[in-house]
């Protein structure tokens, strides 16, 4: 098969980016051709990745490429621009179009609650050859749009293999981890919806109980400078490491090493990092968004006291890690099966 993945391509290594790259690498390892088209403003030079500078350039590229499947990856809000792109792809002859919809919070949003057959969104979605929902709530929404069951799959957006515990961590992270116990980790984009300021403030409470505790914040985004200022203003600034973006393999190794993964959010869907941590057997403390998988310690939104209490309880419990037994690739195999079964 010849496939093109369309969506945000790393960096940064957010959840959608991670899933897109995982599918691409899996397909290439299994003898398929898979390029990628980056859809945001960042311009890079990754091999096999196209970086169109405008909608016109993107349209010309899609017309020119001779492929079997166009696989779109949408997260966040569903804009008219994205809807138009999906419609355009369905009009191209000789190609199948698949959409992975990653925005777990969209079904409960005002726009998501208006899902219906007679909407423009419904018209476009019914034209797609395949739709991948990353959770059951999204799948139910697409059924309201009229997507036929034989074209709809629920496939979790993560794939992970156990990292080698002997793999060295970057010196800066290794030094920080060696100096702090418990070692707490948060992984995600540095954006307002991830409520990272709450974690920084909660470290004051956590340090009262665990004086050597440390928090590493991994990711990139628009709040980087303001978070640096917030951290620098704290008397415990040396206990927080704003690391920056990190390659996925290193991130998984850090997840394996940490005492707990924190996922505080104001708005969130089905988090890839949460799924990865659960697969590795790493304890996870996350804001309750109504759609978290089993096995997490849930806390209310923006609740500093409950976050501190949860860290204390999880660290004090010290339960043994229980990684999952499968190879972590079933979700990628499910995507490949969907490609083969497209009508």
Question: Which positions does each model-derived feature cover?
Answer:
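Conserved donor-binding/catalytic core segment of Leloir-type glycosyltransferases
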Residues: 4, 172-194, 200-203
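Donor nucleotide-sugar binding/catalytic pocket of nucleotide-sugar-dependent glycosyltransferases
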Residues: 122, 126-167, 269
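Nucleotide-activated donor-binding/catalytic signature segment of Leloir-type glycosyltransferases, i.e.
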Residues: 228-246
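Short alpha-helical donor nucleotide-sugar binding micro-motif in glycosyltransferases
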Residues: 245-246, 253-258
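Aromatic "clamp/platform" in nucleotide-sugar-dependent glycosyltransferases that forms part
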Residues: 266
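Short hydrophobic beta-strand element within catalytic cores of glycosyltransferases
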Residues: 279, 283-286
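A charged, aromatic-enriched C-terminal amphipathic alpha-helix characteristic of glycosyltransferases
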Residues: 316-343
């Amino acid at each position: 098969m010849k496939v093109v993945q369309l969506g945000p391509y790393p960096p940064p290594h957010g959840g959608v980016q991670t899933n897109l790259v995982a599918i691409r690498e899996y397909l290439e390892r299994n003898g398929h051709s898979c390029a990628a088209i980056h859809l945001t403003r960042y311009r890079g030079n990754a091999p096999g990745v196209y970086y169109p500078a405008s909608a016109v350039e993107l349209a010309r590229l899609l017309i020119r490429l001779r492929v079997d499947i166009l696989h779109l990856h949408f997260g966040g809000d569903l804009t008219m621009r994205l809807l138009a792109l999906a419609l355009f792809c369905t009009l191209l002859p000789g190609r199948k179009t698949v959409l992975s919809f990653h925005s777990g919070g969209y079904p409960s949003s005002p726009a998501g609650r208006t899902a219906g057959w007679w909407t423009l969104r419904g018209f476009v979605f019914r034209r797609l050859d395949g739709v991948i929902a990353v959770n059951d709530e999204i799948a139910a929404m697409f059924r309201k749009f009229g997507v036929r069951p034989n074209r709809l799959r629920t496939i979790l957006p993560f794939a992970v293999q156990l990292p080698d515990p002997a793999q060295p961590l970057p010196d800066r992270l290794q030094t920080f981890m060696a100096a702090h116990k418990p070692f707490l980790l948060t992984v995600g984009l540095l954006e307002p919806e991830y409520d990272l300021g709450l974690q920084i403030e909660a470290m004051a409470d956590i340090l009262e109980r665990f004086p050597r505790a440390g928090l590493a914040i991994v990711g990139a985004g628009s709040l980087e400078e303001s978070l640096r200022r917030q951290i620098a203003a704290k008397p415990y600034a040396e206990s927080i490491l704003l690391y920056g973006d990190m390659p996925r393999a290193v991130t998984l190794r850090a997840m394996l090493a940490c005492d707990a993964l924190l996922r505080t959010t104001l708005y969130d869907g089905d988090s890839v990092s949460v799924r990865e941590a659960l697969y590795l057997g790493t304890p996870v403390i996350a804001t309750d968004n109504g759609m978290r998988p089993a096995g997490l310690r849930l806390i209310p939104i923006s609740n500093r006291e409950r976050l501190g209490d949860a860290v204390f309880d999880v660290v004090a419990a010290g339960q043994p890690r229980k990684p999952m037994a499968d190879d972590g690739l079933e979700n990628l195999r499910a995507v490949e099966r969907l490609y083969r079964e497209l009508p």
